């Protein structure tokens, strides 16, 4: 794709997700989420992005399986457009957070977005590593359940059966589509470093190191919030029941 096409696709994506956010803002919001309507709309917009790009990334490999054999040079217009659209979303979300939230509360996500925009930007501008970028977007399959978890918590449904089921699916997809994907990408980068220029290899290595560290921390937070806490509450209930029987 030419530079003009990249700019048009990315710019259109920024506008599209702005419209999505605007449209979501017109829908009813749970009473428990009204005190932070901006966060509710922001997470809901992120959910839409994850749903679109998660499905799109799988379709890229289904429609163009040759890309899996060569993640550097081989790609389709369909997969290139996916990466450009994702850049547009991350630019939109970056600006949305900078404008509506204190940086001290969102610096981790802002830093994450800068890293992703940089890495994906190199890919779409050089028309190389597009397949590698599409592999990275497979993590959005997990993000669907991750964002749904946040929405359910804001709607005060953290104790519902649906939330518990989503937590289990979220944990499973986290391991498969985040941890395993990042591990595979790191291995691929190391094995193919002779085929990658030093600058791109350095950017990719630093980006993956940052993503891996952030995802390990997030995994611990999820475990502590959804499983360790539930386990402790269950133990406390059992202790109280024993005390009643005595």
Curated annotation (Swiss-Prot):
Any transmembrane segments, and where? 5-25, 43-63, 79-99, 107-127, 128-148, 199-219
Q: How does it sit in the membrane?
A: Multi-pass membrane protein
SMART domains per record: TLC
In this chain the TLC domain maps to 35-231
Superkingdom: Eukaryota
This protein's GO CC annotations: plasma membrane
Q: Which UniProt keywords apply?
A: Cell membrane, Membrane, Transmembrane, Transmembrane helix
Report the main location listed first in the record.
membrane
Cross-referenced InterPro entries, in alphabetical order? Answer: TLC-dom, TLCD
Q: Which Pfam families match?
A: TRAM_LAG1_CLN8
Where located?
Cell membrane
Q: What does this protein do?
A: Regulates the composition and fluidity of the plasma membrane. Inhibits the incorporation of membrane-fluidizing phospholipids containing omega-3 long-chain polyunsaturated fatty acids (LCPUFA) and thereby promotes membrane rigidity. Does not appear to have any effect on LCPUFA synthesis.
Q: Which family does it belong to?
A: Belongs to the TLCD family.
Q: Identify this protein by name.
A: TLC domain-containing protein 2
* Taxonomic lineage from the root: Eukaryota, Metazoa, Chordata, Craniata, Vertebrata
Q: What gene does this protein come from? A: tlcd2
